[in-house]
Amino acid sequence: MKKRPSLFKIHRWIGLIAALWLFLLGITGIFLDHDEWRWLRQTEVPESWLSSSMMRYLPATVMRYVVVDQKDSKHWIGGSERGMWRTTDRGLNWNKLQFPKNQHPQVNRLAKLNIDDAQTVVLATDDGLWIMNGLSSDIERLALQGRFINMVSPGSDDNEVIGVDNFGKIFRLNINQPTDIEFIDLDETKIIGLPEHVNMYKFLFDLHFGYGLFSRKISTWINDFGGIALMILSTTGFLSWYLQRRWRRNKHLAPSRDKRILFSKSVYRMHAPIIGLLGIVPILYLSVTGILFNHILTFIDWGEKIDIERTKLPYVWRYESIKGEIDQVVAYPDSPDRMSISTRYGILNTNDGGLTWARDSITDPERGQLFRADDHVFYSNNLRQFFTKRDGENEWIKMTGLPTIVYDAEFYGDELMIKNSRGFFKEKGGYRFEMDEMKHPNLKAATLYLFMIEIHTGNVIHPQFKWISDLFTIMGIIMVITGPILWLRRKW
């Protein structure tokens, strides 16, 4: 009889100690799973709320994608999830561009078309495609209203763009006939050249961020349920302890015995057999991987040395379909059947309109940024691999001098400018880059999304709070283990 009270006390007291932090991990984890939620990426908070380490990522949220006026190198427009801006003095001053009817979509990519020496820009947003018929023109709606378009790029013909609808569908569209949209059939695809093994770090990374089990949507739902379970378990556990304690101390305020019993049973059944049991798996893998991410350098060093057979990993790693896996797509001039896409396995190429895809061996199997600028295709990833390839050439060329992943590039005259999270980088010859003096808009504000990262990691409290977070997370793991044991003894 003594075992259950002792185990129950352990479960209860570590739960009360860790409840608040586990609740915060749950709710912020859900927010961070959904970077498509516009309000998270556009709600502004003071820069002072961010740590110095997080401030490095702030410039990327202001401006990721850029276009330069080919007739005036001081005239630029640029955009990101926070909106669109224009400068006419090479970055000294920026003015915000307005969307019709005060709408404010997230800008996910810019496709730059040169038609009869006129510059046209097509914007991929979380609310379909928009267009600027000239860099000084207004922004107008083009097509696919209400759809999350994560990529758009120049197509194989002059008036055409190619894009990706919500990571799952590749489409073509003639900007002069925007209602006539062609979706490429991806139901029967063959994928060759994929690696036989995946390192442990990559698998656990995608698992923690909601890409590692099934499709992007289902994996995110499972992670969300893990976060919701943490919130409900923390709340119901605290309420059960607090109210029973309050009723014992203030018996005159307590409800009737029958109501107390009904309340206790209801809270217990929600806490243990429903949420507690269903949430075991996501809570465990999110907790363990969360501890590993608190010590990222050690985690990378350890995880990259361990290989796992791809066939033994969850369904999504088998790549029986590429739907939900398409981060970016580029087309090639006068070759409608030729395309390249960026995926979790790096670049995949097709020459038959999407029936067969082959992995490009130049890059490691890693997510990256693939895009077209003029007659060049660019690719980079977080492994510090920076490549470009000119149309008509077969070999990728390495780029140097770039500290972080590249989001966009612009040719003007004999010059090439790269845009990444640190700022603007100008080519000095031979695809060697140095940071340029050009600046992005100074918004003097951070985003709520970045602040959620600060809370989730504990940096909002102190850079070394990760050790306390580890302790609380281990407490959560202990509760997940002891909870089913207690339930097996009591059942419903």
Protein language model features and the residues they cover:
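Extracytoplasmic/periplasmic/luminal assembly and interaction segments
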Residues: 66-101, 329-361
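Juxtamembrane interface at the cytosolic side of transmembrane helices
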Residues: 2-18, 217-281, 464-492
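Alpha-helical transmembrane signal-anchor/signal-peptide segments
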Residues: 32-55, 292-317
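Hydrophobic secretory-pathway targeting helix
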Residues: 1-47, 277-295, 466-470
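Conserved Ser/Thr-centered positions that define the repeating blades of beta-propeller domains
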Residues: 87-88, 131-134, 172-173, 350-351, ...
